Design a protein with these regions (language model features):
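Short glycine-centered segments of the SAM/dcSAM-binding site in methyltransferase folds
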Residues: 50, 147-148
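Class I SAM-dependent methyltransferase SAM/SAH-binding core
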Residues: 50-54, 58-109
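A short acidic, Gly/Pro-enriched loop at the edge of an enzyme's catalytic core
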Residues: 108-120
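A short SAM/SAH-binding and catalytic strip from SAM-dependent methyltransferases
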Residues: 119-131
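A short glycine-rich, Lys/Arg-flanked "PGG" loop and its adjoining helix->strand segment in the class I
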Residues: 133-145
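C-terminal alpha-helical "lid/dimerization" subdomain adjacent to the S-adenosyl-L-methionine
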Residues: 151-214
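C-terminal lobe and adjacent flexible extensions of AdoMet/dcAdoMet transferase-like proteins
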Residues: 214-223
């Protein structure tokens, strides 16, 4: 599986693009992050330990995870230095610098040891990964035994989706909402085959009003 299943293009994250993402995340998209953080905790049962937010951008989901789970430390991971700088400014402004760190890294080669993180989350970045198999292989490597992922895209609820899609289309009628894309049976089968290939036998795919989310589980005692 060499190509992204959504067949989307890799974005260019220069500082202008990173600042634009930051503005949207802190305004139009702001309500979704606490909801997604709560959904992630509910879906996985993970409330403590180390959480990685992959493709964190301006750090909004990372901050929501830290705010809703006081016993959890978080690392906001992004391949863009510009995004990491903006994320750190946001983290510091929120007074969360003792709970959240930033790290530069690509999902296809994560800068973490094996069995490292209890929870790995990501909202929206999966649609830009160039090789899903390599990415999920790395994610499963870094996931600690007993850990889970909550990776995908969505708005947390149907009400928030309707609100935000309407507002974004007001701003830009050509805006491409990835939430409009639906996964069919072939897509789901490809995911099942991919997870088997990386050695993950316990997983579930959530495809409902909260969005499209992949919950991988690494069995306790696995290496």
């Amino acid at each position: 599986m060499q190509k992204n299943w959504t067949q989307t293009k890799t974005p260019v994250f220069n500082r202008e693009a990173a600042l634009k993402m930051n503005e949207i995340a802190k305004t139009v998209f702001a309500p979704i992050y606490p909801v997604i953080a709560q959904n992630a905790r509910h879906a996985t049962g993970i409330n403590r330990g180390l959480c990685l937010d992959l493709g964190s951008g301006p750090g909004m989901l990372a901050m929501a995870m830290a705010s809703t789970a006081p016993d959890m430390s978080v690392v906001a991971v992004d391949s863009s230095e510009e995004s990491n700088e903006i994320a750190w400014e946001n983290i510091r402004d929120a007074g969360l610098e003792a709970r959240i760190k930033t790290a530069k890294g690509d999902v296809h080669g994560l800068p973490f040891p094996d069995n490292h993180a209890n929870l790995i989350v990501s909202r929206g970045s999966m649609f830009f990964w160039t090789d899903l198999l390599d990415a999920f292989k790395e994610i499963f490597r870094v996931l600690a035994p007993g850990g889970h992922t909550y990776i995908g895209g969505g708005f947390g609820s149907s009400a928030l989706k309707d609100l935000i899609v309407a507002e974004m289309l007001k701003r830009d009628p050509s805006w491409d909402c990835y939430a409009k894309k639906k996964s069919d049976a072939d897509d789901l089968k490809r995911f099942e085959e991919m997870f088997a290939a990386i050695g993950c036998s316990t997983f579930r795919i959530i495809n409902d009003e909260t969005g499209f989310w992949i919950v991988l589980s690494k069995t306790a005692g696995a290496e």
